[in-house]
Amino acid sequence: MGTNPLPRIKSYVKKVGSRNFLAIDFASYMGKTMTDIKPLLYNLNNLGLITYNSAKGTIAVNGRMYRWLGARSGRMDHDVIQFISEPERGVKYNASLSLLNYDLSMEGVNSIVLSNAQGTKVFPDQGKLILKENRSFTFKGVILAGRTEIYGDEFSFDYDKFRLNLIETNWLRFFVKRKEKHTDGDLVRKLQSQLIGARGYIDIDDAKNKSGKNEKKHQYPILKCVKKTFVFYDNKNIHDGAYDREKFYFEVEPFEMDSLDNFETSGMRFDGKLISASIFPDLKETLVVQDDYSLGFIKQAPEEGISLYLGKANYENEISLSNKGLMGSGDIDYLSSHAESSAITFLPNSLSAIADL
């Protein structure tokens, strides 16, 4: 019909003083015939903006139309969420509705953008999700929130709170800014350490700023881990997997991290303790990003040294942890012997060192 008809409907409601009126009267107001206006009425009815009863010839304007107008004008908040179902060949349906709880099980939903402004989207595993009341849903798969990626077996999205609940995660990893210039122009790279077993939630944006138009909300998305998480160093590339995750791991305390889309690498700090398979006593430390893009730390042993291998030796000097392993350099006193080395590798059942002559 050329111009947007919604403002005209709003004006007509104001004129007649009611959201309920005859379709033929509205057609006359628009200077149209019923034949002209029927396709529009059916379309608006399908969108849920009005309820058009063709048998009775009546129109009822729904509240959704006013929310739609408010969102388009910028006066009201809105979201960008769309559920696009494109099932693989052989799948007979896009969705099935449970008559017990009205959950809608959807197929072929490969991705859902939750916030363009905050760079947050989800990728349901095998394109499957369960849509619940008021656009909330559950799924398994991958969450991408800014420069944070999470894979898990159970997530839920709470529309009212605009929050992703991390119920059962497998791993969480970050993409950090490169320290060096890169020829392909890639400004970020994947952190080489993962946080395992994260439980908590991600607040995508302020619940009243689902559109992301209020750009003053710089702190979002916000990740809050409410349980302890773990960093392991048992990759086969690290001394042939010598650091068994059952005995050697870093236990990260619950933490909160904001600005997941634009955080600084220097701000990534995870307090906790290293359990080192009895190489050292438990070490309270803070994980930060190391030069090899893994999470680790560098610390100085106390002046009197630190017990090594359950008191069999004493170590003095630097201790470092990264994907290079648990390393050191300095003095080692073992029984009645003394040695100095600038390259020590501490392993659960042994150490290797290049002695300084």
Predicted regions and their residues:
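Structural signature for solvent-exposed beta-strand/loop edge elements and short helix-capping sites
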Residues: 1-357
